[in-house]
Structures are given as structure tokens and as C-alpha cells.
Curated annotation (Swiss-Prot):
The gene is kdsD. The keyword Hydrolase does not apply. Homotetramer. Keywords: Carbohydrate metabolism, CBS domain, Isomerase, Lipopolysaccharide biosynthesis, Metal-binding, Repeat, Zinc. Its EC number is 5.3.1.13. Residues 210-268, 277-328 form the CBS domain. This is Arabinose 5-phosphate isomerase KdsD. Pathway: Carbohydrate biosynthesis; 3-deoxy-D-manno-octulosonate biosynthesis; 3-deoxy-D-manno-octulosonate from D-ribulose 5-phosphate: step 1/3; Bacterial outer membrane biogenesis; lipopolysaccharide biosynthesis. SUPFAM superfamilies: SIS domain.
Amino acid sequence: MSTFDLQPGVDFQQAGKQVLQIEREGLAQLDQYINEDFSRACEAIFRCHGKVVVMGMGKSGHIGCKIAATFASTGTPAFFVHPGEASHGDLGMITPQDIVLAISNSGESNEILTLIPVLKRQKILLICMSSNPESTMGKAADIHLCINVPQEACPLGLAPTTSTTATLVMGDALAVALLKARGFTQEDFALSHPGGALGRKLLLRISDIMHTGTEIPTVSPDASLRDALLEITRKSLGLTVICDDSMRIKGIFTDGDLRRVFDMGIDLNNAKIADVMTRGGIRVPPNILAVDALNLMESRHITALLVADGDQLLGVVHMHDMLRAGVV
């Protein structure tokens, strides 16, 4: 790294705030460019039967990657192609059903200009995003989106700062407008984010994490209280379910109920579980979202739920299962 002498009188905080002010003013100018061309771009992308192919060089390319990713995760299939690679074979990734969104602040990116005749020959719709509608790219575009800003936040006027922020925001405006047009939902978003926290919350169902079969702590109504306590200890879920031979739920007994029994002075060896159980028990269907089941647990101040179809016991889920699955 090159070394420089610290300039006298430099106020880092003031410099940072000045950048924010300049970029805020630049973004405020974008409002005038959300116009008929913007609507035409949205309509074209909405009706596109292929994908949106985003292109850009340098900093515009980095911003283009983010715009393509935002499109893809909000219901608009998209990917990024580097213009330099496109002119050496990657142009074959683009089909006549696609739309190209080309980004260049100046509108004079040589790498993109080289591709335009080929795109035109294939009748591929070209949307250009630049600061100059009269630029070569602006004139060649089927639709031009202006991202002109008064000044860069860089005091030298060289490093792309305000202009790249404006480009990113215009991309967000397109993506969100299309999201609304598609009626895109949280569930749709989760389908493309199954590995994230939101995906787990919106996709994971109780049936995916519940204990089933021999993992379920159960005893018959004729069992002794002592046998029920042994079952609670063996299965380590903090409860046992009292069921008949057909696994129909008769009641539930938890470690919290045990404290109540001790206070009552009941004989553990002679008492029947049916005499001290809580009838019913809080139940949820197997298709309920895990996050909704967790909310129910928290609202009822309990740590486990029965999973059932009516009176038929299907499984048990504990708060710890939620933690392991990353729902919390």
C-alpha cells in the first residue's frame, strides 16, 4: 500500500457526512427518471419469457452483479455476464427470449458497444442504464434508463460513488416494482433462500422436525405414575403422552405436573397416571409452520407440543428441536 502523509485539518467524520449528503442529493434527483421509460422497462421485463442478462464493466459490473442477484431472488430470473467474456464466447448464453440490461455511467463502454450489433441482429431487447440518453449506448437502446447525478462524492470527481449508488437504487426500483407486479410473497422469497433464516422460518414445518415412532414418550391410561416418570426420563422431552392402544390421545403429563403432584403428596407407586394427567393437551397439525408452532409455545409458556390429527397422535416437538433447526 502506498503511504501518504496525513493532511492537516482533515476531519474524518465531517468528510464522511459530506459523502452522505452528496449521495442523498444525488438520489433525490432520480425521482424524475422514474418515468414512462421506467414503466416500459418494467413491462418488458415482466413479459419476458427468458431471463434478464445484466452487463457492466468495472464498478458498473460489480453493481450489475448485485442487481442481477436482487432480480433473481425477487421473482425475476436473471444472471450477470461480463461483457469482455461475452465477446469471447459467453454471448452464446444469451437467447432471443432474453432481455439485456447494459450498465455504463458514460454510455460509452467499448466492451458493451462491441456487443450491440450482435444483440440487434438477434433481435434481443436492449435496456441501457447510463447518465446520458444521447450517448452511443443510450441511442442504441430500445429503452434507456437515466441515472444522471449532479456530482460524485469523490472530491476528485473520479471514483464512481454517487453514480454507482444511483445505479444500484435504480436496479432496486426495477426489482421491487416487478416484485409487486408479480404478487411475490414471503413464501416465494423463501423458496429461493432455503438455506437462510427466513427460508427456514417460512418453509420448515413441524412434520420436518417432530419426534415420531418410538421416540415419542407414551404410556397407557392404566400405567402407574412411576412408569410415566420413567418414560419421561427415558425420552428426555419433558413430558409423556397418555394414549390408548390406537394412539388416540387421552391426556398429557409434564415435568411441571410432577411438581404439582409432589405438592399434593400423591404416592408415586400407587397412583394411576390417568388420575393426575392433564386431559387433552395443546396440539398442532403436522403441516403447521415451525415458526408458528414456536410462537404458540411462547404465548402459552410451554416447551413442547403434541402433533396430532384430531385425537390421533403423530408426534411430539420440543423447544430444543426448534433451536437445533435454526427456527429461533
